[in-house]
């Protein structure tokens, strides 16, 4: 764990006084012109119904209305278009090539073989023929056209899955540690993730009404009230994870709310350290937006974890900024009111004080590849999936077909990791040989080079409307060039975290990678260095607006210096700080301070 988490506290600073009561009542919200546009959309939506049902019947367009485009996120979807086709369609005076991205809610990332087969069928029938494992332990479909939305969601529902709250201003998909060697701890983490997901799920019946042709609740929207969320839901997205040391593969410090398992010497659960206020997104050129690593709030007993989760979320519901969405995440709420005031209000709502955090140690945030035997004697195979894209590559690995064949004979389950990989889990010893045969037959990858196995990339172009540059499509080529530079300095087998996003919203968590690339414009990136290998420290901007072709040459001298000057066991992110190439980021507010190279590379 990065030592900045236990450093001496900063000098006292002045914080604003928290509101005494919930600031947004329905009556206030309805007439408050100062609220962001999204707040008015939520208030008028009838608990997330809007005009979605009518919009699906408008066959003259592949899109939906702008307001419904915000509401459909709560249902687990984003309206997108193929940006590669925009110029041609504009020239022909055609509408954009609209389609929808659909994201599932899969708490803890666990699916059965039956569910896997159904999800595979959906990908081939209604989407673009691929499954995309995300950085938050679930699946996304891309390329689903409006006329297929209902069919797709009904097929998902048929195998007891859904997309409710996978996006939007709610508690989103809850992640859980997947370390297969720690069977008991994983089970505890998974149970908590499931319980939080179910407990904080929106209660509106809108999803079933619209997508499954369910009946409207008697009495209409007034009886479909949200007892926790209310009409306005949360000010912004809210992300929750459950981690089990020593692995931080869920990147607990990058999320709004985290639970870190504290285990005894027999790996039995003693309780949870609670973290609050992490988040990656920011906006280029706006220093009042920044990534932030979470603070340790305290320790809670296992029986209190659900109460703590709801309390943290509802304090954010009541204290969060509903006027400016760019400053609406929990990280800004804590910066505004202070951790002490936030903790006091959480404790008041829980009904008891939190204890002080317990010691723990993370050693990294990557996955363990290959076969691992769990404490219960079951076996687990972690497969490397480049950028999480499960597809068949002509002349290369056939992930879609290979994993389908495994699902047809597998008796355990599948687990998605926060690093976009897939675990074939709970395999009896006698079934390993057949799975190994299928892995070899379909060219699936058990491992990868050191740089690739520690890499992440978001989707970006052509479907993401926010992307400023390529990510998933460019990352493999860039990794090849960086691997060549590392090999030249004897560093081919050095584990270094490297992540890329097409914009600064940070879906692939680039600001806690030792090397982070963030899209600035077409074929141009900001380069960030100096994060901790275990995900506990933010990086710092090293070079601004770098041409994609120049990135290897920019980093090569640093690789050479690292090979010459590192001390035994020193990670690359720690080295560039110790050697004076970049400043250490203590936390979010100073992320934009002292940027750029502090000295030239010898």
Swiss-Prot record:
Gene source species: Methylobacterium sp. (strain 4-46)
Pfam hit, one: NIR_SIR
Swiss-Prot/TrEMBL cofactor(s): siroheme; [4Fe-4S] cluster
Keyword Iron-sulfur: yes
Similarity comment text for this entry: Belongs to the nitrite and sulfite reductase 4Fe-4S domain family.
Residue sites binding siroheme per the record: 507
Binding locations of [4Fe-4S] cluster: 458, 464, 503, 507
UniProt region (Disordered), positions on chain: 1-23
EC number: 1.8.1.2
Binding partners and assembly: Alpha(8)-beta(8). The alpha component is a flavoprotein, the beta component is a hemoprotein.
Annotated gene: cysI
Keywords, alphabetical: 4Fe-4S, Amino-acid biosynthesis, Cysteine biosynthesis, Heme, Iron, Iron-sulfur, Metal-binding, NADP, Oxidoreductase
Pathway, per record: Sulfur metabolism; hydrogen sulfide biosynthesis; hydrogen sulfide from sulfite (NADPH route): step 1/1
Key word Electron transport present: no
Origin: domain of life: Bacteria
GO MF term (any one): metal ion binding
Catalytic reaction list: hydrogen sulfide + 3 NADP(+) + 3 H2O = sulfite + 3 NADPH + 4 H(+)
GO biological process: cysteine biosynthetic process; hydrogen sulfide biosynthetic process; sulfate assimilation
NCBIfam families hit by this protein: CysI (TIGR02041), PRK13504.1 (NF010029)
Annotated function: Component of the sulfite reductase complex that catalyzes the 6-electron reduction of sulfite to sulfide. This is one of several activities required for the biosynthesis of L-cysteine from sulfate.
Record protein name field: Sulfite reductase [NADPH] hemoprotein beta-component
Membrane-crossing residue ranges in chain numbering: none
Record's GO cellular component terms: sulfite reductase complex (NADPH)
InterPro entries the record matches: CysI, NiRdtase/SiRdtase_haem-b_fer, Nit/Sulf_reduc_fer-like_dom_sf, NO2/SO3_Rdtase_4Fe4S_dom, NO2/SO3_Rdtase_4Fe4S_prot, NO2/SO3_Rdtase_4Fe4S_sf, NO2/SO3_Rdtase_FeS/sirohaem_BS
Record note on cofactor: Binds 1 siroheme per subunit.
